[in-house]
């Protein structure tokens, strides 16, 4: 299966004129992928040069929508979250990249509460998505100063929402093992020291080393 998006880098490298040309060239055929508010420099640049916060600027140019993916969204305020929510725009969290670059933590809990479709990404920082679960969980608990939050949101991002995002571009059912769905299988060298069941899957994912 092949599908395409219209990729832009980040707001601080794209002028208003370029945004308008992107929308004209795309002509509504697909969504956009762009890094947004990954660091505070993105916010400062947008305010200084365009007088608008990043999400507001994207809305002004018609970039947002239900097939657009915003990477990172670390430094977004309440008004920007509302815009993302009302335009049904998607957000992809890249926890290891964000922590490695020391640029902040995506407000996953707050975005999730608004019903925003959140996916799990890597921004090419790692190829170990199970390790990303642990990093995302620890970062959310640290950010919110609560040791009992984040698990449902983080696992949903990887195991449910990534498939939902993919289904917006590919004409197939993804992320499930059933007749008619696209093959979506990984093979792991599992050594059954303990039973593997739906009753202890949370513990196994959180405490086991990645394959």
Identify the function of each model-found stretch.
Residues 16-17, 44-45, 104, 131-133, ...:
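Short, well-ordered secondary-structure micro-motifs
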């Amino acid at each position: 299966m092949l599908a395409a998006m219209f990729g832009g880098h980040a707001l601080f490298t794209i002028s208003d004129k370029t945004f308008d040309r992107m929308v004209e060239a795309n002509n509504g055929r697909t969504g956009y992928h762009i890094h947004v508010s990954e660091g505070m420099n993105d916010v400062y640049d947008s305010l200084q040069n365009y007088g608008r916060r990043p999400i507001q600027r994207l809305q002004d140019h018609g970039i947002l929508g239900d097939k657009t993916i915003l990477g990172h969204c670390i430094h977004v305020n309440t008004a920007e979250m509302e815009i993302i929510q009302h335009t049904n725009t998607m957000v992809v969290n890249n926890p290891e990249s964000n922590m490695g670059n020391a640029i902040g933590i995506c407000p996953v809990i707050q975005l999730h509460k608004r019903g925003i479709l959140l996916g799990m990404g890597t921004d090419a920082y790692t190829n170990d998505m199970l390790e990303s679960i642990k990093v995302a969980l620890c970062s959310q608990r640290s950010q919110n100063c609560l040791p009992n939050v984040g698990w449902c949101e983080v696992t949903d991002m990887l195991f449910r929402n990534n498939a939902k995002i993919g289904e917006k571009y590919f004409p197939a059912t993804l992320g499930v093992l059933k007749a008619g769905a696209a093959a979506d299988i990984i093979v792991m060298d599992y050594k059954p020291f303990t039973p593997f069941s739906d009753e202890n899957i949370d513990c196994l994912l959180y405490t086991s080393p990645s394959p």
